[in-house]
A protein has these predicted regions:
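Extended, low-polarity segments enriched in aliphatic/aromatic residues
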Residues: 1-194
Length: 196
């Protein structure tokens, strides 16, 4: 039976929360993190860093939505750079991001603009209105997240018109600050903003 750790093992550097993780994650020698290539209504992009939410015992609303780019409890946008991003703490956690040996992003059928709906065909070359047919693998989480972000930004550019089954937010990956967490995770001079 999987159960929560005995004490809080993830601590958010803005001092807002700390939380438990599941015991199997705490005891793991290493983690292989598998995510899908897709956008997300609140985080705007959702890859391996956000995938670690499943390792934390509390609901995601309490943990992360307050630092997402598009949605906060007070309804305000949290756009721009050098803002607190909880994903940086997750990427830097010794139990989560630092214990991840391999990051995999499944883009065989790339996601549409709404994470709750099905995949759509991609327009950018070499796909040319076909499925993405891609897998991304890296030991470097910042690198794989950056490549996936570039991929999504190229496809979901506000010009391409995707299938109406999932095109609600055509321009999600092109918002000011969407890659702020990647800049922070890659740059130690910004560590005071998010300090895992």
């Amino acid at each position: 039976v999987v159960k929560p750790s005995e004490t809080d093992l993830i601590h958010f550097s803005d001092k807002s929360y700390s939380d438990r993780i599941y015991d199997v994650v705490e005891q793991a020698d290493y983690i292989i993190n598998v995510a899908n290539l897709r956008t997300h209504g609140a985080a705007l992009i959702s890859f391996t860093a956000k995938g670690h939410l499943g390792s934390i015992t509390s609901e995601t609303e309490r943990l992360l939505h307050y630092s997402h780019l598009a949605k906060r409890k007070d309804g305000a946008a949290y756009e721009g750079y050098k803002k607190y991003r909880a994903l940086v703490d997750i990427m830097g956690s010794r139990y989560l991001g630092q214990n991840t040996m391999l990051n995999i992003v499944d883009a065989l059928f790339g996601g549409g603009s709404d994470e709750t709906k099905g995949p759509v065909k991609y327009f950018m070359p070499p796909f040319n209105n076909d499925w993405c047919n891609s897998l991304f693998l890296s030991q470097d989480q910042v690198a794989i997240e950056s490549v996936c972000y570039d991929f999504m930004r190229s496809e979901w550019n506000g010009v391409n018109k995707h299938s109406p089954i999932n095109n609600r937010w055509e321009i999600l990956p092109d918002r000011d600050g969407i890659d702020d967490y990647l800049h922070q995770a890659a740059d130690l001079s910004l560590i005071h903003i998010s300090d895992p």
